[in-house]
Amino acid sequence: MWAGCHPDAASLLRLLLAALLAAGALASGEYCHGWLDAQGVWRIGFQCPERFDGGDATICCGSCALRYCCSSADARLDQGGCDNDRQQGAGEPGRADKDGPDGSAVPIYVPFLIVGSVFVAFIVLGSLVAACCCRCLRPKQEPQLSRAPGGPRLVETIPMIPSASTSRGSSSRQSSTAASSSSSANSGARAPPTRSQTNCCLPEGTMNNVYVNMPTNFSVLNCQQATQIVPHQGQYLHPPFVGYTVQPDSVPLTPVPPFLDGLQTGYRQLQAPFPHTNSEQKMYPAVTV
């Protein structure tokens, strides 16, 4: 019916559809696939025309290493003949190629850097451990060093102990010999022959020295034994009085009191009102004239 009634309208509709298809084809343009440039950098593909191109730049032009959109059909690029539009290893899932955009080459100096850092860390840790050990052991060594000087001090003070004991022994010996001399003098007042026997055992000039300390065993020893035991005159003398003797004629004698016996040699024993037994030997001070 449309063909019999309106033959021009059918042909007009056909022309309109062809124009719309041609306009859509011109508006879409060609697609430039992605590629690797000369520096090995991957370039992403794009649709012609691009954003900054004109409306008529619908053809992919250029070379395999550099592609762009243009409107000249003579500069059109045959993308089928290029071999750099595929990424190497892209077909294997989970694998990234070193030359691809996702892959990166490992530098050569990285292993040396790792080994050097481990060596330096080992040295630093060893130094810290050594410093801690030295600091922990130092307080234990200080008391031992402080005790060491005390040893010679103790050794130095030890020889002073016998000297103290010797001085004490000499003082006790002097006191005992003084008491024995006074007792022997008192016994000599009672029995002059015994005293003369004792005097014969001593060397000449010993009895004239009032500072001589006579041992207690001289009264019971005979002359031969006493002569061997009698020490040197200066052994029992105090240092300030060594070499000094009593001058018998330098001091004038005072008159003898009536209560003293003039027959004795200058002193006698005071008589007690009650005599004591032989077991109790009492000491009385001697009175000199």
Swiss-Prot record:
GO annotation, biological process: negative regulation of fibroblast growth factor receptor signaling pathway; negative regulation of Wnt signaling pathway
Gene Ontology CC terms, in alphabetical order: endoplasmic reticulum; endoplasmic reticulum membrane
Sequence intervals crossing the membrane: 105-125
Residue ranges annotated as Extracellular topological domain: 28-104
Presence of the UniProt keyword Transport in the record: no
Biased composition range(s): Low complexity: 163-191
Subcellular location: Endoplasmic reticulum membrane
Principal subcellular localisation of the protein: endoplasmic reticulum
InterPro entries the record matches: Shisa, Shisa_N
A Pfam family it matches: Shisa_N
Cytoplasmic side of membrane: 126-289
Keyword set includes rRNA-binding: no
Topological relation to the membrane, as annotated: Single-pass type I membrane protein
Alphabetic keyword roster: Developmental protein, Endoplasmic reticulum, Membrane, Signal, Transmembrane, Transmembrane helix
Reported function: Plays an essential role in the maturation of presomitic mesoderm cells by individual attenuation of both FGF and WNT signaling.
Protein name per UniProt: Protein shisa-2 homolog
Organism: Bos taurus
Gene name for this UniProt entry: SHISA2
